[in-house]
Curated annotation (Swiss-Prot):
Organism of derivation: Nitratiruptor sp. (strain SB155-2)
Gene Ontology biological process terms from the UniProt entry: ribosomal small subunit biogenesis; translation
Name of this protein: Small ribosomal subunit protein uS4
Keyword Lipoprotein: no
Domain S4 RNA-binding: 98-161
Subunit structure: Part of the 30S ribosomal subunit. Contacts protein S5. The interaction surface between S4 and S5 is involved in control of translational fidelity.
NCBIfam families for this protein: PRK05327.1 (NF003717), rpsD_bact (TIGR01017)
Record region (Disordered): 30-49
Length: 208
């Protein structure tokens, strides 16, 4: 299954939760989900009972769309999380959080993970001084993530950094807004990660 590239707000309405796919519109209260908090389509406002499988599938879709990960890659991450010590669901979320595009987003260099992924793909991001253009690159604690010199004054990046005054920056990164770089100081604990996903249901889905 390829990565979804369609209208992102339809996805949020279908899943019934904000996935931080539209940065400024969400912060301004202008997202389609807030205006129409029901699934798109002719019968969107009808309430229907969701099966156990449907609930499990919905949680997987939330995580996939939120982090921008295709099915094959997501399944491989789950297998890796399952081999690790500790809680499989929490391991999965922590692996997703360590993706380079997500770390760029968490540092406030992009208002959405989608824009962060574009920055990485187009070579605007350096890791420990070297250009890395792979969004799934796994960041390690202590690594320096920086926007390359020619791109630091990009209006979208600067606007993203301005918005962090309103949204804040997560505690597991240290960011220098003026020099546009940050340090991934540690792997976050699950309770620190503010995503509306019940990973337990994802584990149940893949364990069948």
């Amino acid at each position: 299954m390829a990565r979804y590239r369609g209208p992102v707000e339809k996805i949020e309405r279908r899943l019934g939760v904000s996935l931080a796919l539209k940065g400024e519109r969400r912060l301004a209260g202008k997202s389609a989900l807030e205006k129409r908090p029901y699934p798109p389509g002719q019968h969107g406002q009808r309430r229907s009972k969701i099966s156990e499988y449907g609930l499990q599938l919905r949680e997987k879709q939330k995580a996939k769309f939120m982090y921008g990960v295709a099915e094959k890659q997501f399944r491989n991450l789950f297998k890796e999380a399952n081999r690790m010590e500790g809680n499989t669901g929490e391991n999965l979320i922590k692996l997703l959080e360590r993706r380079l595009d997500n770390v760029v987003y968490r540092m406030g260099f992009a208002t959405t993970r989608r824009f962060a992924r574009q920055l990485v793909n187009h070579g605007h991001v350096l890791v420990d001084g070297k250009r890395v253009n792979i969004p799934s690159f796994r960041v390690k604690p202590g690594q320096k993530i920086e926007i390359r010199e020619k791109s630091k004054n990009n209006p979208q990046i600067q606007r993203s950094l301005e918005l962090t005054n309103q949204t804040g920056i997560v505690p597991w990164v240290d960011v220098d807004k003026e020099k546009v770089f940050g340090i991934f100081t540690r792997i976050p604990e699950r309770e620190e990660i503010d995503i509306p996903v019940e990973e337990r249901l994802i584990v149940e889905l893949y364990s069948k």
